[in-house]
Amino acid sequence: MKRDTGRCAVVMPQGVLFHGGKEGEIRKQLIESDKLEAIITLVGGVFYGAGVSACILFLNNNKPASHQGKVCMIDASTIYTAKRAQNIMTEEDIARVYQLWQDYRSVIDYCAIVELETIREKGYTLSVNSYIEKTQAPTVSPAEVRKKFFEALEEVKAAEAALTQLLEEGGYING
């Protein structure tokens, strides 16, 4: 990578984003040097024969002024197409992830633009999901779940009775 203008992308297992020891020291150096421009986490199984979830680290020795002091973190673990033997990223999936990076703004469930100070406060952990705001699922009370369950059970019983009646009328079963 050229000292002043070099850029590169490195594919790594996601563990490098949060493991301690030497990996933690390397993360700290990347953050403090402000060379880390973006992180994209991928779904497991994108790379044939490797079930481990991967990430791509984008390094840039000449970050644009608007990106300095920040890291773009993208969770692309839900942006893929499932195939029988492996998960793939179609051209459309890749374009969607690329657009998140180009837009360079936080998007709930997918992307966060994180200040270096925030990363320092979290001990240089780069686990993308700890920075991206997630949609809160509505909370349903146990009483409501129970009520809906028994309503659905009654619907199943009514459908079963109607089916039995039709089968009896058609002579398929004896009542």
Regions found by a protein language model. Give the residues of each.
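A conserved structural/catalytic subdomain of Rossmann-like adenosyl-cofactor enzymes
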Residues: 1-175
